[in-house]
Amino acid sequence: SIMKMDGSQQEENLDVISTGSLGVDLALGVGGLPRGRVVEIFGPESSGKTTLCLEAIAQCQKTGGICAFIDAEHAFDPVYARKLGVKVEELYLSQPDTGEQALEICDTLVRSGGVDMVVVDSVAALVPKAEIEGEMGDSHVGLQARLMSQALRKLTGHIKRTNTLVVFINQIRMKIGVMFGSPETTTGGNALKFYASVRLDIRRTGQIKKGDDVIGNETKVKVIKNKVAPPFRQAEFDILYGEGVSWEGELIDLGVKYDIVEKSGAWYSYNGSK
């Protein structure tokens, strides 16, 4: 079909789903992750990728949204998810055997129009059927990249039409022999880089200690690509073990940044009260 934008279709504000982090929502420029789009969240191990996605699922469920989690890594922890505010009993969970099965389930969920958010954890774990059925040591060059490219070609139209948010979690690999620039790359070929409207790079920058015990991570998120707002903004926040994003700490940090809260030494004051 072809249509003319003659004013009959009013430009509406973009539908978004909050990430559960005020700083990341601000860095995204639209107040959250855009619906009807593909989002990629990548970073090193234990940097908070799955935590950020579970926080977003919890926020989506709070507004009455229906969410699905495709656990290709077979590492979903319902106890931890519940601690982050996820209503596990209302979450659709799939643990597929192959990459083809995972992406077929994702496509079916999106086409149904009955799901608001789908998370795929992770692209690196989407193993092609041929690789699973083959022998250890067999070479399967480019199979995963081809699988992702084909799946995204099919998915994007359905995602836009049903206004579903699809988040792909991805891992980092090192390119061999890179002399200049970053040797880091994400798995699954280049297709996801092109199809994603938002790409978030999440990193652990330090530890949070209480005495000698480490109780959390200092985390930095960089918006590497953004088709819905200006890119390259950053957000810093704390992830506390067993609790998720430290909302209170983030509120104070943003208060200081925007001169709402005054900081002098180790003291914070708001309207004169410390």
Curated annotation (Swiss-Prot):
Cell location: Cytoplasm
A Pfam short name: RecA_C
Xref: InterPro entries: AAA+_ATPase, DNA_recomb/repair_RecA, DNA_recomb/repair_RecA_CS, P-loop_NTPase, RecA-like_C, RecA-like_N, RecA_ATP-bd, RecA_C_sf
Presence of the UniProt keyword DNA-binding in the record: yes
This protein's GO CC annotations: cytosol
Intrachain disulfide bonds: none
Keyword Zinc attributed: no
Keyword list, A-Z: ATP-binding, Cytoplasm, DNA damage, DNA recombination, DNA repair, DNA-binding, Nucleotide-binding, SOS response
Gene Ontology molecular function, alphabetical: ATP binding; ATP hydrolysis activity; ATP-dependent DNA damage sensor activity; single-stranded DNA binding
SUPFAM superfamilies: P-loop containing nucleoside triphosphate hydrolases, RecA protein, C-terminal domain
Biological role stated in the UniProt entry: Can catalyze the hydrolysis of ATP in the presence of single-stranded DNA, the ATP-dependent uptake of single-stranded DNA by duplex DNA, and the ATP-dependent hybridization of homologous single-stranded DNAs. It interacts with LexA causing its activation and leading to its autocatalytic cleavage.
Family from the record: Belongs to the RecA family.
Listed name of the protein: Protein RecA
Organism: Neisseria pharyngis
Organism ancestry: Bacteria, Pseudomonadati, Pseudomonadota, Betaproteobacteria, Neisseriales
